[in-house]
C-alpha cells in the first residue's frame, strides 16, 4: 500500500511550539483523509526548528464507492414531485428508478445512487491547502509579496517549501500537485542552513530521513535529545564533572538545533559565590545552557554545557568562548542584584506605617522589602486587594490553623509576614521562578530561625502531584493558609475553574491542601477554615459573596476523588463514604482505606450483598408509599430470624459506633461483618411483605436498622457489585 510524506519547511519555528504543531499536523491530515474515506496503517510526526514532517504508512490508494438509497414520492404522485425527485437524485428518467412496496403506505420510487470513490492523490491535493491555510498556530505572520493580498497565508514564520510525495514502497513516488500562495508542492527539500543548503530530491520517508542526515539534519526530535543528553554527560564526565539534569531545557534545546554539537564553556570561580539557583537560571534562561557540578556535590562548578547547531572547524572553541563572555556578563548582573537585595532600601522613612502594621524590623533587608510591598499597594487581584491585604488575611487564617496543627504560633506569624517579601527583590524580579527560594536565602542571611526560613520557601509547596510536601508544622501551616486564602478568595468573587480553564491554578491549590492534610496526617476540618478565611476577606471587602462553603467543599470532594483514584481507590467506595458535608479529609481517606480492605474480603462481599438487598427493598417500598414503622416493635416478631437479626443489629451498631468514635474504622467494619449470618438467615426465613400491614411495616423498619447501622460507616447502596 502507498505511503505519504509531507514536509512543511519554514524559517525557525519557536521551540515551544514545535511538538504541538507536529501533532496538530498529524491529526489534521489523518482526520481529513479518514473523513474522505481513506484508511491508513500508521502515522508519525517529526519536527526540527525549520520543518514539520509527517510520515503516513499504508494509505489506501482510493476511497471506497458509496451507495445510497434515496426515497422518492409515491408512484401516483403529481408530475412536479416526480420531476423534483429525478433532479435531486441525478436520474434522467423514471426507468432508472426502482419501485419499493410499503404495505402501509403503498408503492414508492427509490433511487439507488452510487458515488464513486476518489483517488488518494486527488483527496490529498484537495485537503492539504486548507490544512496549511487554517493551521492552528498560536501566533502567525504574513510574509513575502503575497502578504499584501487579502486572505494570504499566515504561518508561524515564512513558509519556504512544501514536500508532498505519494507511492507504494517499491514503486516510484508521485508528487501530489497543489500550491499555497505560490508555494508549489514538490519532492525537493533542503538540508542544514549552513552545512548543506543545496536542494535534495526525496521519494519517501526512509529516503528523506537518510538524505537529511547526510545533509546535517537529524529529523527525529527524540533522537536529537538522546544525542544531546549522551554527549553532554560524556563531556562533563571527561572533565571530572556531572551534568545537572534539566528535562525542560533538553526539550527546548532539541528544538533549537538540527545538528546538535555539544561543547563546554566556563566562567570565573568568583561567580560561584552567587546562589546556585541564580547561576543555573541565568545560564539556562539567557543562554539555554546546562550547568555542571562535581560528582555528588550540591554546589555547581564553573563549567557549563552548551549545544551548538554548527560543526565548527576549530572544534567549537570560538563558539564556547563567545558563550562564556555572554554568561560572564549575565552573571555579573546577577551578582549585582544579589548584593543589592541584601542592602538597605533608600526610602526607609516612608515604610514606617507598613512596618508597624506587620511588626517588621526595618533594620533587616527582607523586612524592608515586605514593608515596601505593602506601601506600594502592589495588586494581588483587582477584586481581592493588594499583596499587603492578602498577607494580613493569611496571617489571620494561619493563626487559627496553628492551633489545629500544633505549630509554634510566633514562628508561623513571622513566616507569614515575610513569605511574600522576596517579591520585591531584584532576584525574583529577574527570575520569578525563584520566589520563595530567594526569600529563604535572604531570611537565613538576616538570622531568621530555620523553621521560619524553611516556611518562606515551602509555603508554595506542593506545586504538583510529584512535588515535595512540607512536613514541618510551621511550613505546613503557612502553606495551608496561603492556599486556602487563594481558594476562598477566588470562590468569593466567583472566578472558579471552568472546563479546561484554570487561570489561577485553583485545582493545583486544592490538590496541595489535600496532600498537605493527608500526607501530613493533619486533622483539619475544612468548613471552619473556610469561615475564618471568609471572615478575614469580608473585613476588607464587606460586599464580598458569603455563601461559598458548600460549593467549595464540593470542589474539594471532586479533587479528593481524583487524588484517591490515582492512588488506586475505587470511585464507588469513595462515593460511599463521602457525605455532602464531610470536611475532614483525613477521616474520609481512612474510611475509604478501611472500606476497601473490608469490601475486597469475602465477609465484606457477602455483607454487601445482604445489605444492598435490604436497602433496595426498603427504598422500593418507600417509593411506593408503603408504611414503614417509626421504630421496631419486638412484640410483632413472629420468627426467630427476626429476633436474632434485631439483637445482632443492636450489638453491631454499638460496637461499630464505639470504634468510629475511636476512628478505628477497620474494627467498625469487622463489627458490622457479624451481621452477615443474621441478614442471610432473615432473607432465607422471613417474608418481608407480609399480608399483615403491621408486621410488614415492622419488618421494613428492621431493614431500616440495617441501613442505619451500615450507614454509620458507608452508604452501601453506592457500592457496585
Swiss-Prot record:
Disulfide bonds: none annotated. Its EC number is 6.1.1.14. GO terms for molecular function: arginine-tRNA ligase activity; ATP binding; glycine-tRNA ligase activity. GO terms for biological process: arginyl-tRNA aminoacylation; glycyl-tRNA aminoacylation. The keyword Nucleotide-binding applies. Tetramer of two alpha and two beta subunits. This is Glycine--tRNA ligase beta subunit. It comes from Rhizobium meliloti (strain 1021) (Ensifer meliloti).
Amino acid at each position: 500500500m502507498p505511503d505519504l510524506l509531507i514536509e512543511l519547511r519554514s524559517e525557525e519555528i519557536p521551540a515551544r511550539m514545535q511538538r504541538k504543531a507536529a501533532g496538530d499536523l498529524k491529526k489534521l491530515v489523518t482526520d481529513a483523509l479518514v473523513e474522505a474515506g481513506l484508511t491508513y496503517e500508521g502515522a508519525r510526526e517529526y519536527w526540527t526548528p525549520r520543518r514539520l514532517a509527517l510520515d503516513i504508512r499504508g494509505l489506501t490508494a482510493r476511497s471506497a464507492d458509496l451507495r445510497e438509497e434515496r426515497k422518492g414520492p409515491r408512484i401516483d404522485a403529481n408530475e412536479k414531485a416526480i420531476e423534483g425527485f429525478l433532479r435531486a437524485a441525478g436520474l434522467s428518467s423514471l426507468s432508472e428508478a426502482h419501485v419499493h412496496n410499503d404495505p402501509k403506505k403503498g408503492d414508492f420510487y427509490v433511487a439507488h445512487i452510487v458515488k464513486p470513490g476518489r483517488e488518494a492523490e486527488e483527496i490529498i491535493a484537495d485537503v492539504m491547502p486548507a490544512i496549511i491555510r487554517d493551521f492552528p498556530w498560536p501566533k502567525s505572520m504574513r510574509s513575502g509579496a503575497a502578504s499584501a493580498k487579502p486572505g494570504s497565508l499566515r504561518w508561524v514564520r515564512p513558509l519556504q517549501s512544501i514536500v508532498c510525495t505519494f507511492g507504494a514502497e517499491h514503486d516510484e513516488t508521485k508528487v501530489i500537485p497543489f500550491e499555497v500562495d505560490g508555494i508549489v508542492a514538490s519532492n525537493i527539500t533542503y538540508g542544514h542552513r549552513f552545512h548543506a543548503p543545496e536542494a535534495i530530491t526525496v521519494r519517501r520517508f526512509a529516503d528523506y530521513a537518510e538524505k537529511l542526515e547526510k545533509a546535517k539534519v537529524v529529523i527525529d526530535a527524540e533522537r536529537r535529545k538522546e544525542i544531546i543528553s549522551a554527549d553532554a554527560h560524556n563531556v562533563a564526565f571527561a572533565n571530572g564533572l556531572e551534568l545537572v539534569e534539566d528535562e525542560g531545557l533538553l526539550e527546548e534545546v532539541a528544538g533549537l538545533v538540527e545538528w546538535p554539537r555539544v561543547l563546554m564553556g566556563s566562567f570565573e570561580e568568583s561567580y560561584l559565590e552567587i546562589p546556585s539557583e541564580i547561576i543555573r537560571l541565568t545560564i539556562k534562561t539567557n543562554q539555554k545552557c546546562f550547568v555542571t557540578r562535581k560528582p555528588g556535590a550540591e554546589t555547581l562548578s564553573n563549567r557549563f554545557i552548551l549545544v551548538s547547531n554548527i560543526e565548527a572547524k576549530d572544534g567549537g572553541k570560538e563558539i564556547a568562548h563567545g558563550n562564556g563572555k555572554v554568561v560572564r556578563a549575565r552573571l555579573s548582573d546577577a551578582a549585582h542584584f544579589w548584593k543589592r537585595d541584601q542592602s538597605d532600601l533608600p526610602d526607609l522613612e516612608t515604610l514606617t506605617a507598613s512596618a508597624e502594621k506587620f511588626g517588621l524590623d526595618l533594620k533587616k533587608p527582607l523586612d524592608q522589602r515586605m514593608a515596601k510591598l505593602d506601601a506600594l499597594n502592589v495588586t494581588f487581584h483587582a477584586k481581592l486587594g493588594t499583596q499587603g491585604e492578602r498577607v494580613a488575611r493569611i496571617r489571620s487564617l494561619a493563626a487559627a490553623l496553628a492551633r489545629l496543627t500544633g505549630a509554634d504560633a510566633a514562628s508561623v506569624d513571622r513566616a507569614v509576614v515575610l513569605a511574600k517579601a522576596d517579591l520585591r527583590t531584584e532576584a525574583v524580579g529577574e527570575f520569578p521562578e525563584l520566589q520563595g527560594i530567594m526569600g529563604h536565602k535572604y531570611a537565613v542571611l538576616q538570622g531568621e530561625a530555620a523553621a521560619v526560613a524553611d516556611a518562606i520557601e515551602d509555603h508554595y509547596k506542593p506545586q504538583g502531584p510529584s512535588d515535595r510536601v512540607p512536613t514541618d508544622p510551621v511550613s505546613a501551616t503557612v502553606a495551608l493558609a496561603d492556599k486556602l486564602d487563594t481558594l476562598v478568595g477566588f470562590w468569593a468573587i466567583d472566578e472558579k475553574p471552568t472546563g479546561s480553564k484554570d487561570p489561577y491554578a485553583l485545582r493545583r491549590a486544592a490538590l496541595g491542601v489535600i496532600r498537605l492534610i493527608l500526607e501530613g496526617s493533619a486533622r483539619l476540618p475544612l468548613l471552619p477554615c473556610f469561615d475564618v478565611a471568609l471572615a478575614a476577606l469580608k473585613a476588607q471587602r464587606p460586599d464580598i459573596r458569603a455563601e461559598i462553603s458548600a460549593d467549595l467543599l464540593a470542589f474539594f470532594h471532586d479533587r479528593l476523588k481524583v487524588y484517591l483514584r490515582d492512588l488506586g481507590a475505587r470511585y464507588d467506595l469513595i462515593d460511599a463514604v463521602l457525605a455532602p458535608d464531610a470536611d475532614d479529609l483525613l477521616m474520609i481517606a481512612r474510611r475509604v482505606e478501611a472500606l476497601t480492605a473490608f469490601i475486597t474480603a469475602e465477609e465484606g462481599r457477602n455483607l454487601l450483598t445482604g445489605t444492598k438487598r435490604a436497602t433496595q427493598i426498603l427504598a422500593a417500598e418507600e417509593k411506593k408509599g408503603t408504611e414503614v414503622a417509626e421504630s421496631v416493635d419486638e412484640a410483632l416478631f413472629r420468627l426467630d430470624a427476626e429476633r436474632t437479626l434485631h439483637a445482632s443489629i443492636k450489638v453491631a451498631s454499638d460496637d461499630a459506633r464505639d470504634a468510629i468514635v475511636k476512628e478505628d474504622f477497620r474494627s467498625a467494619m469487622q463489627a458490622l461483618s457479624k451481621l452477615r449470618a443474621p441478614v442471610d438467615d432473615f432473607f432465607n426465613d422471613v417474608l418481608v411483605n407480609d399480608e399483615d400491614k403491621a408486621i410488614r411495616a415492622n419488618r421494613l423498619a428492621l431493614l431500616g436498622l440495617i441501613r442505619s447501622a451500615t450507614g454509620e460507616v458507608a452508604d452501601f447502596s453506592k457500592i457496585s457489585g
